[in-house]
Amino acid sequence: MSDDRYCVFGNPVAHSRSPRIHALFAEQCGQAMTYEAIEAPREDFAGAWHAFVAAGGCGANVTVPFKEDAFRLADVLSQRARRAGAVNTLVRGRDGRTYADTTDGVGLVRDLEAHGVTLEGARILILGAGGAVRGVLDPLLAKAPSCLHIANRTASKAVRLAEEASPEGRVTGGGYSELDGAFDVVINGTSASLGGELPPLPDTLLAADGVAYDMMYAAEPTVFLQWAAAHGGRGIDGLGMLIEQAAESFFLWRQVRPDTAPVRETLRREL
């Protein structure tokens, strides 16, 4: 009997660490499965998914630029996927339908909590208003922060996303120039760190003992985490978020929850 097949779809995707992560999960949990990276054509994600399923594929992760394509493709959406407007996990159901979920927000919250960060009652700031931010708002709100503010270069995008995420006003939005006050947790949901760029942030942004979290990660601290260290903050990069969201996807497919700590240590050594 052949192993169950899983994959990650992206374009480009050769750099993805997901195959390594899921190989470690499978070994740890004794699961007979394979996991590969597939570069889908930008104009035909649906075709790539259906071909994978026809060849025996059981499920997939989805990364840029296909998260919205996967959302539209799905037959059944989880509530959190419907709220996020994008998905990163697909499951081929026994009934032949495609089930979809998003695990990014859960991954972020679990990684923050694994680092001892208290979200309840915290003042949280998120930088950016793209898909990466949209997908994490609900899980953060579920932790009952005292405030959740979105800041973006284009202020109107932040305001619109805040209104969509919380019509009752629990989330606020605005531009970088309007930032005022100190925050307990500042999350960089932009890809600026990949280009070595830093959003225009005031020096007083981080509260005493504040935490700066970058969704990006690298072998060395990103420019955002360097900024945090220079302003007395504790920096955490996004490697743990990647591993925690992968663990949630793994659970959706296999109904087994892996221990993420040893995988995080292994991946950190391999950076």
From Swiss-Prot:
SUPFAM superfamilies listed in its UniProt record: Aminoacid dehydrogenase-like, N-terminal domain (SSF53223), NAD(P)-binding Rossmann-fold domains (SSF51735)
GO cellular component, one term: cytosol
Family matches, as InterPro entries: Aminoacid_DH-like_N_sf (IPR046346), NAD(P)-bd_dom_sf (IPR036291), SDH_C (IPR041121), Shikimate_DH (IPR011342), Shikimate_DH-bd_N (IPR013708), Shikimate_DH_fam (IPR022893), Shikm_DH/Glu-tRNA_Rdtase (IPR006151)
Involved pathway(s): Metabolic intermediate biosynthesis; chorismate biosynthesis; chorismate from D-erythrose 4-phosphate and phosphoenolpyruvate: step 4/7
Record's keyword annotation contains Amino-acid biosynthesis: yes
EC number: 1.1.1.25
GO biological process entries: amino acid biosynthetic process; aromatic amino acid family biosynthetic process; chorismate biosynthetic process; shikimate metabolic process
Keywords attached to this entry: Amino-acid biosynthesis, Aromatic amino acid biosynthesis, NADP, Oxidoreductase
Domain of life: Bacteria
Chain's role: Involved in the biosynthesis of the chorismate, which leads to the biosynthesis of aromatic amino acids. Catalyzes the reversible NADPH linked reduction of 3-dehydroshikimate (DHSA) to yield shikimate (SA).
Assembly behavior: Homodimer.
Protein name according to UniProt: Shikimate dehydrogenase (NADP(+))
